């Protein structure tokens, strides 16, 4: 009977866990819909920003301005890389499957790849899980911040990027990339690696559409071309991080929704298995009692 009581307790415990995971799945589904909408709107803004970049660069090319002095821009084919800053984004919480692990693996892979080429790598971390991992393993993270990946905020992203941009402009680093787990669809995510600094010259040659550029930019902005590009580039870099945070949050909710759905289904299966075990144990107990009663009756004859 003690065995039956143990099984009953296990069934009750698993059912309670099932209720929790199911509730977490519903919460993640609701949050995912909101995050997906924000990501969609933010992507539209990012594309508009890219279009403005293209217009300005095309206009400069049409005017015969090929030599861009802005430090934000480099000719990628001739760029010599000696130092790289990697900004990684992970979640502040767990229970989201391989979401954080996959990002960390990619960061380690990129770090090793650069080191094999004798390129110095510095890490900048956003998200408690990633920062904890590297701290536990004795890997230095230059700048770290928590509670930003779970609550993306443009002002905080802007502040975080300020130091990164300063290091780039002062020559402390030659390249800045962002690594995060991005939202692909409701049931899948993908690791994304994006170079945000420097911005390559090749953008000029990808958009030879002078008429469209002239139609889009109808007035002459004040300041030199490089000043205009610096202002746009600064906004582009800041928004690149902000969009990555939004994209990562949507992917996190997607991963957690899947993880909780899997956990709920596993709990259902375990309840079925335990119920079968309980019924078998109960049947065995009844059979044993009947055998003992019959044996007692026979002994009294």
From Swiss-Prot:
InterPro entries: ATP_synth_F1_ATPase_gsu (IPR035968), ATP_synth_F1_gsu (IPR000131). GO terms for biological process: proton motive force-driven plasma membrane ATP synthesis. It is found in: Cell inner membrane. GO terms for molecular function: ATP binding; proton-transporting ATP synthase activity, rotational mechanism. It is a peripheral membrane protein. One of its GO terms (cellular component) is plasma membrane. Signal peptide: none annotated. CDD domains: F1-ATPase_gamma (cd12151). Its main location: membrane. Keywords: ATP synthesis, Cell inner membrane, Cell membrane, CF(1), Hydrogen ion transport, Ion transport, Membrane, Transport. F-type ATPases have 2 components, CF(1) - the catalytic core - and CF(0) - the membrane proton channel. CF(1) has five subunits: alpha(3), beta(3), gamma(1), delta(1), epsilon(1). CF(0) has three main subunits: a, b and c. Belongs to the ATPase gamma chain family. Produces ATP from ADP in the presence of a proton gradient across the membrane. The gamma chain is believed to be important in regulating ATPase activity and the flow of protons through the CF(0) complex. NCBIfam families: ATPsyn_F1gamma (TIGR01146). This is ATP synthase gamma chain. It comes from Helicobacter pylori (strain HPAG1). The gene is atpG.
């Amino acid at each position: 009977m003690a065995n039956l009581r143990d099984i009953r307790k296990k069934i009750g415990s698993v059912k309670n866990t099932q209720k929790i995971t199911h509730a977490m799945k519903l919460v993640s589904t609701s949050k995912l819909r909101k995050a997906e909408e924000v990501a969609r709107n933010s992507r539209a803004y990012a594309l508009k920003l890219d279009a403005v970049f293209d217009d300005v660069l095309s206009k400069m090319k049409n005017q015969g301005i090929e030599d861009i002095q802005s430090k934000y821009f480099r000719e990628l084919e001739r760029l010599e890389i000696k130092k790289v800053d990697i900004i990684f984004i992970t979640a502040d919480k767990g229970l989201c499957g391989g979401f954080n692990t996959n990002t960390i693996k990619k960061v380690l892979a990129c770090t090793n790849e650069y080191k094999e080429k004798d390129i110095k790598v510095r890490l900048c971390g956003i998200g408690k899980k990633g920062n904890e991992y590297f701290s536990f393993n004795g890997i230095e993270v230059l700048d770290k911040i928590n509670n930003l990946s779970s609550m993306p905020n443009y002002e905080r992203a802007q502040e975080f990027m300020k130091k990164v941009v300063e290091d780039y402009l002062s020559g402390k680093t030659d390249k800045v990339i962002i690594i995060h787990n991005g939202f692909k669809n409701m049931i899948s995510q993908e690791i994304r690696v994006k170079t945000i600094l420097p911005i390559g010259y090749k953008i000029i040659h990808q958009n030879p559409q002078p008429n469209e550029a002239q139609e889009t930019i109808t007035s002459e902005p004040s300041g030199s071309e490089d000043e205009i590009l610096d202002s746009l580039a600064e906004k582009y870099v800041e928004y690149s991080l902000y969009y990555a945070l939004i994209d990562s949050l949507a992917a996190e909710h997607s991963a957690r929704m899947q993880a909780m759905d899997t956990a709920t289904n596993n709990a259902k299966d375990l309840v079925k298995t335990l119920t079968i075990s309980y019924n078998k144990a109960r049947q065995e107990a009844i059979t044993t009692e009947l055998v003992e009663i019959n044996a007692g009756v026979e002994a009294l004859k």
